[in-house]
Amino acid sequence: MAKKKAISWIKLQVPAAQAAPGAKIGQALGPHGVSGPQFVKEFNERTAKMDPGIVVPVIITVYSDKSFSFIVKTPPASILIKKAIGIESGSKKSNTDKVGTISKEKLMEIARIKMSDLNAKSESAAFKIIAGSARSMGVEVEK
């Protein structure tokens, strides 16, 4: 059997287990001839075990026969950090205004979750990446 030829890749951020065939998904998939309701059904099934509503990146590969496959990534680090310390958004002036503090344990937990998506060879390298993300949001890292 011949390998399918990929003709397009679509990147979206969609709420886990709560995707709906609305404007955002329809506008992204429609021009490529992909069935929005079919994607929504498969996406919701695959993300059913995740926290409902947490935004997750998804990369959709569209093939020449209008079929598709997709990969669900881990939630963005900023969302995991905001959830861990219970804030709505990061600081607008992260170098002067601090919005909260996060423990090293919580950062390491987030680093372990994100490890598969990060370009890091070790947990300590992943920890440094996530700690940098936290600092850029105006979140202090406990010493």
From Swiss-Prot:
Keywords for the protein's UniProt record, in alphabetical order: Methylation, Ribonucleoprotein, Ribosomal protein, RNA-binding, rRNA-binding
GO molecular function: large ribosomal subunit rRNA binding; structural constituent of ribosome
A matching Pfam family: Ribosomal_L11
Post-translational modification: One or more lysine residues are methylated.
InterPro entries: Ribosomal_uL11, Ribosomal_uL11_bac-typ, Ribosomal_uL11_C, Ribosomal_uL11_C_sf, Ribosomal_uL11_CS, Ribosomal_uL11_N, Ribosomal_uL11_N_sf
PROSITE patterns tied to this protein: RIBOSOMAL_L11 (PS00359)
Keyword Coiled coil: no
Keyword check for rRNA processing: no
SMART domains, per the entry: RL11
GO biological process: translation
Gene Ontology terms: cellular component: cytosol; cytosolic large ribosomal subunit
Role this protein plays: Forms part of the ribosomal stalk which helps the ribosome interact with GTP-bound translation factors.
Subunit structure of this chain's protein: Part of the ribosomal stalk of the 50S ribosomal subunit. Interacts with L10 and the large rRNA to form the base of the stalk. L10 forms an elongated spine to which L12 dimers bind in a sequential fashion forming a multimeric L10(L12)X complex.
HAMAP family associated with the record: Ribosomal_uL11
Family recorded in the similarity comment: Belongs to the universal ribosomal protein uL11 family.
PANTHER family, alphabetized: 60S RIBOSOMAL PROTEIN L12, LARGE RIBOSOMAL SUBUNIT PROTEIN UL11M
Protein name: Large ribosomal subunit protein uL11
Annotated source species: Borreliella burgdorferi (strain ATCC 35210 / DSM 4680 / CIP 102532 / B31)
